[in-house]
Amino acid sequence: MDIKEQLSAAIRQAAQKAIADGVFPAGELADILLEVPPDKKFGDFATNFAMQSARVFRMNPKKIAEELVSRIEGDWLDHAEIAGPGFINFYLKGNVLYDLLRHLYEGGEACFNLPQKDTARIMVEYVSANPTGLLHVGHGRGAAVGSALVNLLRAAGYPVHSEYYINDAGNQIDNLAASVNARYLELLGKETVFPENGYHGADIVDTAKRIVEVDGEKYLSLSEEQRLAAFKEFALKEKLAQLKEDLAAFNVTFDEWFSERTLHPEAVRDACQTLKEKGKVYDKDGALWLRSTDYGDDKDRVVIRDNGVPTYLAADIAYHRNKLERGFGHLINIWGADHHGYVCRVKAALAALGYAPEQLEVLLLQMVSLYRGGELVKMSKRTGESVTLEELIEEVGTDAARYFFLMRSLDSQLDFDLDLAKSHSNENPVYYIQYAHARISSIFRQAADAGIETGGTPEFSRLIDETEIALIKKIEEYAEEIERAARERAPHRIARFAYDTAGLFHSFYNKCRIVGVEPALSGARLALVAVARNVLRHALGILGISAPEKM
């Protein structure tokens, strides 16, 4: 438990004591928010908890603060003072921050991987784009958020499994094969009609060209049915390989790639049969309908069409049942915001099968808009279509793309400034963070060149400058931030924490010399920046971003 957690717990216990003493009426306690005051004369931490509690306790905030201060206990606390209308300023004993810093220094980066939690296994499914075309920037945001969330949950001690659901069954794959077939025939000078629901991307033409390069006119002698079957497998294999290559270049990997085909027909049929046995579906107009309105949906949903073909929902019901049957107790899906209407029907299906709907948690991603020179970028200059993830990586790099995707909460629309992402300046947040890491590494090279030995037992009590104290306090909050960000499914909090930590380091560096001062002070400052570097490297690792030694 870090110092802020200890302080929050002490405030909560003081409030509960006051309730037990009959001073405060019973009621739900307000959230306890602790901040570092801008001026050290106002203490090490401050809270407005007394003012937030005035309505609950029906008392003057200053009186609440007085009762709390008289009951707060902690051997790390020197004293507390009441300021203004009811702020409480806390002054820690001199050794507390230094003891915590020593713990982080001696424990190294491993300190920030929290103990394993005894909780249900979590599956995070994300991206899961149809293997019918290239990944676009919207998929890129989902890939960045999903992979960072998996890293974050693991750092917080949760048992996590990541998965990509391959939509390799159904009409979209038939349309893929038909599109490749049409382009193949066109390339060989044959008359053909392009399918009505076909895919027009340049990548489809490229796939057809590769078939011609490898096998020439071989497929002309086959029936259309045979040709479509062959092209379906060729195109699917190629598209999957491209997906995996693009995602790997974006520092995204999955524990499993799950094929929808494995659900057909048995798993889909079994799920529908279970729903029938439970009385959760009914026949109407030749189709099979899920009673999803019983679970809050705005209308019942078809699971088997009147032609006997399962809907996408039927496959999704079977897939989510499969996830739970594999032993995952909590499912996290990351979908685009345009899927918001689909959430209720999947939860309804799980409830109809007898599962708790809250076992499925759906995170909805908002849109990404690209800007260049202050103008909205609507289409790719290369293809005239949506900008692909591959093109984005080529233009700004993986690190910048990932950070910009992650620096806003996933439920916020993202305006992506391409010019800023490419700039090598402090205005570019990822450059600013990486430069802090590289600068610290440079400090250690300078120390080595100067013959300064690192290690030993640093005299942390020598760190008294306000920029040193501010940096110490920040890095000591990191473990708590990991816990909170994981709990809130908010990797953007780690992006912000890394940025703020880098800022405090730069302020410290600009004011305090590290190499070239007396040895005890130099050793303490070297140890401090070593811990700061560990924090930055660990945070960047969660975000899937490199931590360069030189820039």
Regions found by a protein language model. Give the residues of each.
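Non-catalytic interaction-recognition regions
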Residues: 1-98, 105, 109-551
